[in-house]
Regions:
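Conserved SAM-binding loop of SAM-dependent methyltransferases across substrates and taxa
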Residues: 61-75
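Conserved alpha-helix/loop element of class I SAM-dependent methyltransferases that forms part
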Residues: 11-16, 21-51, 67
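A short acidic, Gly/Pro-enriched loop at the edge of an enzyme's catalytic core
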Residues: 115-125
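A short SAM/SAH-binding and catalytic strip from SAM-dependent methyltransferases
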Residues: 123-136
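Conserved class I S-adenosyl-L-methionine
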Residues: 153-205
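Rossmann-like AdoMet/SAM-dependent catalytic core
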Residues: 202-319
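A short glycine-rich, Lys/Arg-flanked "PGG" loop and its adjoining helix->strand segment in the class I
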Residues: 138-150
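Conserved SAM-binding strand-loop segment of SAM-dependent methyltransferases
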Residues: 100-113
Length: 319
């Protein structure tokens, strides 16, 4: 992890969360719902009991950690929260304490540093919105595989290339304005630009309208993570499959991701996009990944990809 990325998350823990709100609500990221993990990652055959071990790799302010720990608290399962940012860890720990969660171990380290510790293997690894911020994402994935149980499952999220085009173009637009400015100055500039966006700007379309920009202007960590991150890359559907293969993994299924539309499993099914029977017949004759790649380009509305990864031939395919 680069020095700039470390500094960003120390200054702006992400996502913005208030531990006091744990008294009133529980955030439940669907990718980390254990019944779903069991279905797609283990064909429904995994016993989620006291021996179940989950790792949240790049836990941020704790959304996935809290939800996994809540699901495992009664059966005795354990969660390891891995995060290099002390500021983010402070928020995450406070959230867990507010809920009385005692089945969490906190580790302040990068993915590579943690893998080098050779910990006991994990049944499920969450790594959402992290690998695409590494200078070598494939190395990061290989490090995760090194701590994954033989029959384990990884739930990952990567930025989507086509649905994120508005952000890509924004980053190109402001690139010449960033040198010489510290992060606070970059943020002030970005807030000024966002406050007077032309009606045709692609960010408005990507976010669904003015309400998206209003929400951004009320959430500095979101602005920084979305528009000012110093290291990021994005993937199309074929890129996701190739990325998985680089670490010897299969894409078991695409799934939904908390807080975003257009990324559920149904959005990768051509039957949900195409009604012309002749076109549908031609598409159905293609390999699955080609069908899914068509859906991504046709919808142009997938800003990210959430998916489960397993080792080849470990899990029978499921619907």
């Amino acid at each position: 992890m680069s020095k700039k990325v470390r500094e960003l998350y120390e200054q702006f823990p992400y996502p913005l969360r208030d531990p006091q709100e744990e008294k009133d609500r529980l955030l439940m990221p669907p990718m980390d719902t254990l019944s779903r993990v069991n279905h797609y990652g283990f064909a429904g055959r995994k016993n989620v009991d006291a021996g179940f071990r989950a790792l949240v790799a790049g836990g941020g302010t704790g959304d996935s950690m809290v939800w996994l720990a809540e699901q495992l608290r009664d059966c005795g399962g354990q969660v390891t929260y891995l995060e290099p940012s002390q500021a983010s860890t402070q928020v995450a720990r406070a959230r867990a304490e507010a809920r009385g969660l005692v089945n969490v171990t906190y580790v302040n380290a990068t993915i590579g540093e943690f893998a080098a510790m050779a910990p006991e293997k994990f049944d499920y690894i969450n790594c959402a919105g992290v690998l695409h911020h590494l200078e070598d994402p494939e190395e990061g994935l290989r490090d995760l595989v090194s701590v994954l149980a033989d029959d384990g499952c990884i739930g990952a999220m990567l930025y989507g290339e086509h649905g994120r085009l508005a952000v890509t173009e924004w980053r190109k637009m402001v690139a010449l304005l960033l040198p010489g400015k510290d992060l606070n100055e970059q943020l002030a500039m970005t807030r000024s630009l966002l406050s007077s966006l032309p009606e045709g700007n692609m960010l408005l379309k990507m976010g669904g309208g003015p309400g998206f920009i209003k929400g951004l202007l009320e959430n500095d960590p979101e602005i920084v993570d979305l528009l000012l991150h110093p290291v990021e890359c994005a993937y199309d559907v074929h890129g996701v499959y190739d990325f998985a293969a680089s670490a010897g993994l299969d894409v078991a299924a695409f799934t939904g991701f908390f807080g975003f539309g257009g990324t559920g499993k149904a959005h990768y099914s051509i039957e949900n996009h195409i009604t012309d029977p002749r076109i549908l017949r031609d598409l159905m004759a293609l390999p699955l990944r080609d069908q899914q790649a068509f859906c991504e380009r046709y919808s142009a509305a997938m800003p990210l990809h959430a998916f489960y990864l397993t080792r080849p031939n470990k899990v029978p395919s499921v619907a």
